[in-house]
């Protein structure tokens, strides 16, 4: 099929069965508040590992994406989900690398029976031959990860020394920390690091023309204790309704306060 005028030609072939967007650095959401002051938590030399652990809504992916976008030519990004098999992950893994190194691992399609650990070993050896350092990010959206512990340890053991490994996850698997530490420096970034500061609350309020110096509004926002997703939705509601929300009451009355708040925000979009 001919390309229309102005349409960009693909610079590489997409690996069969791969959803390309899951091998690309995510775009930042609208009204994203830059968190460059947290980049120091991520900036580690190779070989090293940085683990970001926090519940959903703490801006883990957005923070790493903002940091990665500034150096995209050396970032290998992979998003994995609950339904991914080891074969699916292998294909995503190779495609993510081909995004920055076109033609990488030509053997992958020619030898379909190669085991995942062997794929990672070959991948690491080929990356070493480039003579460059890379950042490898895995955004792990899987919730039942206990089954991944053994394979994760075996895969990490194959990572080459020219890789800074960054893993984003919702739960902690301390049993892998020893393996991660064996690669070099290990840093763990948690909820206390990712929570919005008071100055960030003020900046978000200013972006949405909300008077942060209003006592009730300020109390409403501070009740979220820096939880980025909750703060963002509170901001939206306050900007829409021109009045504060009793978030503490919402927490006390709901088993899933963030879901309840999200539902409330969605309802206002139809008004």
Task: Show which residues each predicted segment covers.
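Conserved P-loop NTPase "ATPase switch" module shared by AAA+ and STAND
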Residues: 123-148
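Conserved adenine-nucleotide phosphate-binding loops and their immediately adjacent elements
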Residues: 2-42, 108, 203
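A short hydrophobic beta-strand->loop->alpha-helix junction that borders the nucleotide-binding pocket
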Residues: 54, 76-85, 109-113, 191-192
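P-loop NTPase Walker A phosphate-binding motif
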Residues: 48-79, 91, 95
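Sensor-1/coupling segment of RecA-like P-loop NTPase cores
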Residues: 49-50, 143-145, 152-183, 187-190
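Conserved NTP-binding/hydrolysis module of P-loop NTPases
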Residues: 87-108, 122-125
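Loop-to-helix "switch" segment enriched in basic
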Residues: 127, 171, 181-182, 186-191, ...
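Conserved AAA+ ATPase core "coupling" helix
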Residues: 195-206
């Amino acid at each position: 099929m001919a390309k229309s005028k102005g349409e960009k030609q693909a610079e590489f072939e997409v690996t069969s069965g791969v959803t390309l967007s899951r091998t690309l650095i995510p775009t930042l959401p609208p009204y994203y508040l830059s968190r460059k002051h947290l980049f120091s938590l991520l900036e580690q030399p190779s070989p090293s590992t940085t683990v970001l652990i926090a519940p959903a809504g703490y801006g883990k992916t957005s923070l790493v994406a903002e940091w990665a976008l500034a150096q995209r030519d050396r970032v290998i990004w992979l998003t994995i989900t609950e339904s991914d098999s080891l074969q699916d992950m292998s294909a995503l893994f190779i495609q993510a690398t081909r995004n920055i190194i076109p033609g990488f691992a030509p053997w992958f399609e020619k030898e379909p029976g190669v085991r995942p650990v062997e794929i990672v070993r070959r991948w690491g050896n080929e990356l070493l031959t480039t003579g460059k350092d890379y950042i490898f990010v895995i955004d792990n959206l899987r919730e039942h990860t206990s089954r991944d512990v053994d394979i994760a340890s075996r895969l990490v053991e194959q990572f080459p020394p020219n890789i800074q490994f960054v893993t984003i996850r919702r739960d902690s698997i301390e049993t892998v920390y020893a393996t991660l530490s064996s690669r070099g420096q290990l840093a763990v970034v948690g909820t206390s690091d990712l929570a919005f500061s008071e100055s960030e609350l003020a900046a978000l309020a200013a972006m949405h023309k909300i008077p942060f110096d209003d006592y009730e509004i300020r109390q409403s926002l501070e009740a979220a204790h820096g939880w980025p997703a909750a703060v963002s939705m509170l901001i939206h509601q306050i900007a829409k309704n021109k009045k504060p929300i009793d978030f503490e009451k919402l927490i006390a009355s709901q088993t899933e306060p963030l879901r309840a708040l999200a539902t409330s925000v969605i309802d206002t979009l139809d008004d």
